[in-house]
Amino acid sequence: MTVLKLSHWRVLAELADGLPQHVSQLARMADMKPQQLNGFWQQMPAHIRGLLRQHDGYWRLVRPLAVFDAEGLRELGERSGFQTALKHECASSNDEILELARIAPDKAHKTICVTHLQSKGRGRQGRKWSHRLGECLMFSFGWVFDRPQYELGSLSPVAAVACRRALSRLGLDVQIKWPNDLVVGRDKLGGILIETVRTGGKTVAVVGIGINFVLPKEVENAASVQSLFQTASRRGNADAAVLLETLLVELDAVLLQYARDGFAPFVAEYQAANRDHGKAVLLLRDGETVFEGTVKGVDGQGVLHLETAEGKQTVVSGEISLRSDDRPVSVPKRRDSERFLLLDGGNSRLKWAWVENGTFATVGSAPYRDLSPLGAEWAEKADGNVRIVGCAVCGEFKKAQVQEQLARKIEWLPSSAQALGIRNHYRHPEEHGSDRWFNALGSRRFSRNACVVVSCGTAVTVDALTDDGHYLGGTIMPGFHLMKESLAVRTANLNRHAGKRYPFPTTTGNAVASGMMDAVCGSVMMMHGRLKEKTGAGKPVDVIITGGGAAKVAEALPPAFLAENTVRVADNLVIYGLLNMIAAEGREYEHI
């Protein structure tokens, strides 16, 4: 795997904590002269070489690594009650403990093998565990149970509970994806592989754990302890030895209780940490979907309970893998010929969409002074199976104008305390603008992350929605036209055409245009910062922008902000919210 000698491993372990080390000390460890160290360092892997910084006779790495020395590991094991073995390179740490378990099962109990590189590292279902030297904390240990293998089906989730406890003790907020992945939102932090050997009337479970210590640049959708540590505003760097010792202490305590009491005492804790509890998921075998539904929880055996269209299902882990259901919401066919006309009654204009088979057939809009295009479309397209559903903030007079164009009663939907798995934290939901509510509901079609939902219309609203379905509220400010109108009416010298946006405007018109845009962008970025802090754990916070000024706002946001975050312009967001709502009604109808 590498051509590193023992001297390379000693020096690397000395530098792994990221603290400065004098070259004389490093040279003694490498058994060479200090002036030979630079050539010696060039033999390190490329991704390690670039981490070195030299200053005034001291070397340090710009980020810590998960690299150990045998003596330090032995002392750590003694404090934690484990025997230790260090393998700089091996096929698999699980294989090392499995071999020991077959030869001497009692010796395998609480013996831990830590490795830096694995040529055949694997996860559940034989998946390859990808890593580079120093990026991942990888270890395996044995635990002897006086139970047959079939009674240890919940060992995997209980090990995940122990790991999460340890990470929590270090100030890191981590979730569990059934059955045993450690995740931060959509990003995977670590995984657990359990293999068993039955011998002498006892079962030796070999627990293999891999946790990303630093962010692996060659792996997508990954999280790391180091990045979470920095996000949590902890001083200094994460320390791999502290992480490992904390994990061993928690694993020891949890497995002792598990051996005595089973999984039942841990169920509530697991439920609270389960990322997908109450959410839609897909369960796959060999890449094919075998179940889709909503996660209802796990039981005392670690079995997943799922609510599906066909009823309740129970799923053991086995060769099943779980994925969040990110497919766009569509409208189930409740009646073979049912169609919808969806209305978005804004302050200035009415928008509408004809929906057939769960998708927009046509989309239109008109000012309230002339709604004849809506009436013409109704005369052309309507039949006895069209249902009209709308959201309006335009006031009763304009709603009456809309009704005059249509020969069927409109169902105007208000804001509510809860819908589609989203809880509305507005103090008085009946006072909450329904457009803001349906914008939030519609945003779930474009992002399952926490997101800032921005609507640029007569007013600009900037709202916050968490990844776990809490609408937190938001701000309202005048839209671009109202800001310009206010300046024209309330000032003596600013009643002029707005110019263009510039970083440093030098004309009054340009200053007005730039100031208005800066106000909106600043409001968006401030809300994003608040939501980012509240969401925590390095989770992404997206920005979804809708309305007539959406494209201009997205273009005006700073390049650095755009590079670091997902910003998306979504037309007709209110109508998407209505579409999601009637889709949910369709699911309820089908279950009756």
UniProtKB/Swiss-Prot annotation:
GO cellular component: cytoplasm
Source domain of life: Bacteria
The keyword Magnesium appears for this protein: no
Binding-site residues, substrate: 426, 433-436, 508
BPL/LPL catalytic domain boundaries: 83-259
Principal location class: cytoplasm
InterPro entries: aa-tRNA-synth_II/BPL/LPL, ATPase_NBD, Biotin_CoA_COase_ligase, BPL_C, BPL_LPL_catalytic, Transcriptional_repressor_C, Type_III_PanK
Any Gene Ontology biological process: protein modification process
Keywords tagged on the record: ATP-binding, Biotin, Coenzyme A biosynthesis, Cytoplasm, Kinase, Ligase, Multifunctional enzyme, Nucleotide-binding, Potassium, Transferase
Known catalytic reactions: biotin + L-lysyl-[protein] + ATP = N(6)-biotinyl-L-lysyl-[protein] + AMP + diphosphate + H(+); (R)-pantothenate + ATP = (R)-4'-phosphopantothenate + ADP + H(+)
Gene Ontology molecular-function annotations: ATP binding; biotin--[biotin carboxyl-carrier protein] ligase activity; pantothenate kinase activity
Region of interest: Type III pantothenate kinase: 336-592
Classification via HAMAP family: Pantothen_kinase_3
UniProt name for this protein: Bifunctional enzyme BirA/CoaX
Species per Swiss-Prot/TrEMBL record: Neisseria meningitidis serogroup B (strain ATCC BAA-335 / MC58)
